Amino acid sequence: MDYRTLHPQIAAAYRVLETGSPISQAEALLLAELPGELVLDLASLANKVKNRYGTGSAGSELLHACSIMNAKSGVCGENCRFCAQSRHNRADIEVYDLVDAESVLIEARNCFAEGVSHFGIVTSGYGYKRINPEFQRVLDMIDRLHEELPELSVCASLGMLGEEPAEALAAHGIAHYNINIQVVPDRYHDLIADTHSVEERIETIKLLRKNNISVCCGGIMGVGETMQERIAMIFALQELDVSVIPLNVLVPIEGTPLAGKEPLSVAEIVKTFAICRLAHPHKIIKFAAGRETIMKDFQGLLMLSGANGFLTGGYLTTRGRDIADDRRFASQIASFN
């Protein structure tokens, strides 16, 4: 390819396509300054890198689609500023304790029947430092899902973990575990929460990796971080060597401290996804919250800017797009591979 017509920073970044080696943080910071139509040139490169290398360490699929179930909702003692489920906030959401196993099975069956092969059980709260009766119920749910839907990839997001629960999840065959660092670690305290530390999340990630559990870990953009800090978060994930990187865009929710936050521009979101792909050529990069509500008409552009996964069927407290619609969406995206 003749790179002479490209911006010098983009031309230099084509090294990722040729070698599969990631860009440096210094290169990422320069790419973040690209204006206007150059963002589409950057997105084009990220799409090529995704197509060549992005099957990911989480599996061989070209597009990683997953669905989650909010199995325990609200009354969380942590004070995450963006979250509707925190009891410190005043969002109007449904509140309930851990659901029964049959409810989880019904939801999982429906998702699997619609063609979704990854299903996650999500609970509100700090997490589980030891195996208590509630955590044991979650383990029993995982076993039931394996028995009834052996081809389903069963995942979980249960908060911070101690060594015993992490070992138990591995023993019960969990496929992926989600726990996000949200922002660059040194801004976690003031941008996200101060009732727990980001180090507790990182310790959980290390425990999961010690037990050979694939880690799904990413962040949220639009909570007050700068682009430079967002890039620092992307490279912090590189150091943690996670398998799946979900990137969320803040959806401001009434009753939370970030309710009036101005949304990020489409161009800035696209640029972030493209840079993340160039920093993580071989990973699954998944677009989660904000796909429908913030990107709207442009959501397909992110799947052509480095993303190769998405959350379908709904989020924890807000509705997403129907799985059938997303299947049609995915089939159209595949024509650009």
Swiss-Prot record:
UniProt keywords, alphabetically: 2Fe-2S, 4Fe-4S, Biotin biosynthesis, Iron, Iron-sulfur, Metal-binding, S-adenosyl-L-methionine, Transferase
Domain Radical SAM core, chain residue ranges per copy: 58-288
Pathway this chain belongs to: Cofactor biosynthesis; biotin biosynthesis; biotin from 7,8-diaminononanoate: step 2/2
EC number: 2.8.1.6
Annotated binding of [2Fe-2S] cluster, by residue: 155, 216, 286
Entry's Gene Ontology BP terms: biotin biosynthetic process
Metal-binding is among the record's keywords: yes
HAMAP family: BioB
Database matches in PANTHER family: BIOTIN SYNTHASE (PTHR22976), BIOTIN SYNTHASE, MITOCHONDRIAL (PTHR22976:SF2)
Family recorded in the similarity comment: Belongs to the radical SAM superfamily. Biotin synthase family.
Annotated NCBIfam families: bioB
Name of the featured protein: Biotin synthase
Organism: Pelodictyon phaeoclathratiforme (strain DSM 5477 / BU-1)
